[in-house]
Amino acid sequence: MSKIVKVLGREIIDSRGNPTVEAEVHLESGFVGMAAAPSGASTGSREALELRDGDKSRFLGKGVLKAIAAVNGPIAEALIGKDAKNQAEIDQIMIDLDGTENKAKFGANAILAVSLANAKAAAAAKSMPLYAHIAELNGTPGVFSMPLPMMNIINGGEHADNNVDIQEFMIQPVGAKTLKEAVRMGAEVFHNLAKVLKSKGYSTAVGDEGGFAPNLKSNAEALEVIAEAVAAAGYELGKDVTLAMDCAASEFYNKEDGIYDLKGEGKKFTAEEFNHYLAGLVEQFPIVSIEDGLDESDWAGFKHQTELLGDKIQLVGDDLFVTNTKILARGIEEGITNSILIKFNQIGSLTETLAAIKMAKDAGFTAVISHRSGETEDATIADLAVGTAAGQIKTGSMSRSDRVAKYNQLIRIEEALGELAPFNGLKEVKGQ
């Protein structure tokens, strides 16, 4: 019934016009699972390797034919005849066959696409939605929740061609009673933000994740215009809508002199000074979550940041932890941050992703399920968020189909599950 008979890889295009890996897993019963690997722009140095061809004559060197060859060759040969329901075994076969610490032989993009396609095929064979199958794989059958969205409505850093150093300024519609209402509130703030930006003569062009990407006078001004938009939409900042930021600080950290350089506003900080700069923003605005507030290697700085802010707000490690249980375990032991961002292409398989979520939750950390800046129409992260009852999701703004596809899938899931999947809002955020 669920025996694998065919594994197929192909090169498709992501939301930035770059190639990525799409995989199909076909079962004896006729069921097929299909999934695509996302791709990041601001990437942690310890992420699993995304295999690119390096052939400058194709896609400026970003082709993925080597990864596709791995899917259609050794991966397919190893998986044909195996039972798709045994997700951990399927993933381990690919990991062992690759044989490297960071999946450098086949590429995390190849292994992940097959891993997710396999999960989808197995779910179909069991006649159950993907989120329900994921809950079973997670050891929490029938336990679901709808995630609170973090909506990235102003894009900066590596996600935009502007002068804003901090990469993401997000809203969380915490006053919503349902996911669908949260999406509506986010859309209303997004459209009002467009009006606010236009009234100030700013651009309303969008960045990689569908948020606006204007040139602004300062990072604080991004929070100020969002505050105006929230009020214009008829909501109360801090009560109906809270704020979150992803600094992606590794992108503006100068390793040689240990300085955080906000070039957009001509300010330079040591780690301790930047922590106090962030603390000042938290005092000024209802910011409840900050991600990657320092460089991924600045563990001493993160320790200070956690002591300064960790009992007040959620501090999320993305480049810091790269969805890796070995690194997360160190963070938990040393008391670094209190939350992890979950990006399954950072680690390269569904099984390892579930392990990271479990480790975080067991330690009292929160887990925020996340997209990448290079996405496709694949909406698997919506099912992952619901099926693990993670509680929070970060999947961009209210424009671009590669972002909206995830929100639409969440709306469908909420409709199907009803009261079986509660929307807990701000209660999901660490420290709130």
From Swiss-Prot:
Protein name as annotated: Enolase
Claim: Cytoplasm is one of the keywords in the record: yes
Binding site for Mg(2+): 246, 291, 318
Domain of life, per lineage: Bacteria
Family statement: Belongs to the enolase family.
Iron-sulfur recorded as keyword: no
Organism annotation: Aliivibrio salmonicida (strain LFI1238)
Co-factor requirement: Mg(2+)
Function: Catalyzes the reversible conversion of 2-phosphoglycerate (2-PG) into phosphoenolpyruvate (PEP). It is essential for the degradation of carbohydrates via glycolysis.
Co-factor binding comment: Binds a second Mg(2+) ion via substrate during catalysis.
Catalytic reactions on record: (2R)-2-phosphoglycerate = phosphoenolpyruvate + H2O
Pfam families, alphabetized: Enolase_C (PF00113), Enolase_N (PF03952)
Listed SUPFAM superfamilies: Enolase C-terminal domain-like, Enolase N-terminal domain-like
EC numbers on record: 4.2.1.11
GO BP annotation list: glycolytic process
Enzyme class: lyase
GO cellular component: cell surface; extracellular region; phosphopyruvate hydratase complex
